[in-house]
Amino acid sequence: MAAKEVRFSDDARHRMLAGVNILADAVKQTLGPKGRNVVLEKSFGAPVVTKDGVSVAKEIELKDKFENMGAQMVKEVASKTSDVAGDGTTTATVLAQAIVREGLKSVAAGANPMDIKRGIDQAVGVVVEELKKLSKPCTDSKAIAQVGTISANSDESIGQIIAQAMDTVGKEGVITVEEGSGLQNELDVVEGMQFDRGYLSPYFINKQDTMGVELENPYVLLHDKKISSIRDLLPVLEKTAKAGRSLLIIAEDVDGEALATLVVNNMRGILKVCAVKAPGFGDRRKAMLEDIAILTGGQVISEELGLSLEKVELTDLGQAKKIQINKETTTIVDGAGSADAIKARVEQIRKQIEDTTSDYDREKLQERVAKLAGGVAVIKVGAATEVEMKEKKARVEDALHATRAAVEEGIVPGGGVALIRAQQALKTLEGKNHDQTVGIAILRRAIEEPLRQIVANAGEEPSVVLAKVQEGTGTFGYNAGTAEYGDMIEMGILDPTKVTRSALQNAASVAGLMLTTEAMVAEMPKKEKGGMPAGGGMDDMM
């Protein structure tokens, strides 16, 4: 086991603060509408230029092990806030730095770190309650566009396209972000249910111009097992042909003579048919087949339910107005399922979303809700260069998270104003002892920092602007983008309540841990082995 180096009390905390300052000073340059750029070196390819705080934080690793521990703890604040709310990473970093910096001054002056932490936690609780009171619901597309614009570093086109996507697929709909091929951002909306499985054979193609399959008014056969024998399928094929309708088969797999027979029938024009694999795997596949069954008003033909392919009736099959299939996806438009059954299924999945603890499961369940309830929107990000594309895509993803957070918990005035208004509640708040009251004062000072930094990045004097904003009430604040004072909501400068709340809670949590740190342990740096000594007579040549 390698030897360790141990640092205690003030020495440990000051080394940690040095790391916090290096990371936070780099990240906070990006805050606000006039945030500066940070250039990140890449081991290959062009450097990346970004105004995204979390991207900057992720790049920072320090040589000194103790300083690096401080930097990594603040990095945790940024990434945790990003995970929970999708934005607010820079605000969280600025708050964490301010709390740690002010807190360590008090600890060095002899205050009890545990009491300071209790005071900070008490103050955070009060500020969070104030933010909830300030919060207004975010329902109209104008407010959604404004939130998206602010989060995407004041890029209006991004805010507009996100609002448009939410309008189209609803608040529950799935919105994904992809790299586009043009210079402009584009919005593609997929109506109906789409899943990632394409045709099993190119011989099913009946639309040469799109290289896809289009089935009008088809029946849908759903089966949870592999189909290899044509004997199993014959009864269904005969009944469908007699009805003069097309057929889509969705099964675990279709191969062998079954697939060959379907292809031959399709090519000869005896029966318009197509086969695709069922989406998902394992239990998720069963659930998704059940979703498709409810959407199309059919039944999953499963031996577990005592149903077999040979005994299938037309009433067991699902129906849809139109189904489009290409090499990679299948889209079911206007399924014949009853609205009540679909609604009940959506409610059932929503209950599962509430109960699940896994982020991955939650995401997959939300996708299923969207496919049943609304649709899927794809935002294709356009840019001139690869570097710009990556940076823009990251901003669109941030903005999308922020708008979802706004819809969830509402909005507060942006530009650091909400925290200044919540500061009023801390003026009369006192702790159980002097040191706890010091903790409350530390937080009261720290929550001014986001506004100060936004103003500093815009090249103005922070103290002057702060005093003017504190004189005002309600949504009165400072627009750093235009250097004007006014109503922040009217000017469209909004922050999701969830983002501001998460940033404050995460910053205070990690800062509290740092203030109460008494020892730090790190591996000793390895001594570099010297090179070979110079050979005889080499000195003169050096």
UniProtKB/Swiss-Prot annotation:
| Keyword Calcium carried by entry | no
Chain sites annotated for binding ATP: 30-33, 51, 87-91, 415, 495
Q: What is its EC number?
A: 5.6.1.7
| GO BP terms, alphabetized | protein refolding
What is this enzyme's class at the first EC digit? isomerase
The protein's GO terms of the molecular function aspect are:
ATP binding; ATP-dependent protein folding chaperone; isomerase activity; unfolded protein binding
Q: Which domain of life is it from?
A: Bacteria
Q: Where in the cell is it found?
A: Cytoplasm
Annotated function? Together with its co-chaperonin GroES, plays an essential role in assisting protein folding. The GroEL-GroES system forms a nano-cage that allows encapsulation of the non-native substrate proteins and provides a physical environment optimized to promote and accelerate protein folding.
Quaternary structure and partners: Forms a cylinder of 14 subunits composed of two heptameric rings stacked back-to-back. Interacts with the co-chaperonin GroES.
Which NCBIfam families does the entry link to? GroEL (TIGR02348), PRK00013.1 (NF000592), PRK12849.1 (NF009487), PRK12850.1 (NF009488), PRK12851.1 (NF009489)
Q: What is this protein called?
A: Chaperonin GroEL 2
Q: Which organism is it from?
A: Methylococcus capsulatus (strain ATCC 33009 / NCIMB 11132 / Bath)
Identify the gene encoding this protein.
groEL2
